[in-house]
């Protein structure tokens, strides 16, 4: 607290984890789950040998999709730490996440570029002129619905 002064911070329990994953989510439907080791030097963070089961991958994908649907982010990363097999969302508000080829690696970079292009084409094709074509998350929808009730 003494170092952040007036900055808004999210206080979280420290999760001493066995596995850690960084998950891209694009368009609220495309998810890439990447083993990630945040304790490694920067250039080696995507060099992690975690191997989740298909069931755990599905659970993590559902968590990532749920968070992004609620926030309404078109592009985000969610970091999940697994402790005793339970995924904890650690960092999940990254609407402009790092996708630099030098940090995420060629394979992950290629996925981001291809998937973002696919999503942008879908959005362009679905565009309805004169209408609100933005992605509004459940958080904003619910908040604005409550604000409407307060208006005279």
Q: Could you describe each region identified by the protein language model?
A:
Residues 78-80:
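Hydrophobic residue at the +6 position relative to the catalytic HRD Asp in the kinase catalytic loop
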Residues 1-71:
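Phosphate-binding site of ATP-dependent enzymes
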Residues 32, 76, 88-91:
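Protein kinase-like catalytic core scaffold
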Residues 82-152:
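C-terminal active-site "lid" helix and adjoining low-complexity regulatory extension at the edge
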């Amino acid at each position: 607290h003494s170092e952040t002064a007036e900055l808004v911070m999210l206080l979280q329990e420290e999760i001493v984890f066995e596995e850690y994953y960084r998950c891209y989510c694009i368009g609220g439907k495309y998810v890439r789950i990447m083993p990630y080791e945040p304790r490694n030097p920067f250039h080696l963070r995507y060099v992690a040998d975690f191997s989740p089961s298909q069931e755990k991958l599905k659970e993590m994908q559902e968590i990532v999709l749920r968070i992004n649907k609620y926030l309404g982010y078109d592009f985000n990363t969610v970091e999940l730490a697994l402790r005793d097999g339970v995924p904890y969302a650690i960092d999940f508000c990254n609407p402009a996440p790092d996708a630099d080829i030098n940090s995420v690696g060629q394979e992950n970079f290629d996925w981001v570029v291809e998937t973002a292009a696919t999503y942008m084409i879908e959005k362009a094709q679905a565009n309805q002129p004169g209408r609100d074509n933005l992605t509004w998350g459940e958080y904003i929808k619910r908040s604005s619905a409550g604000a409407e009730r307060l208006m005279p």
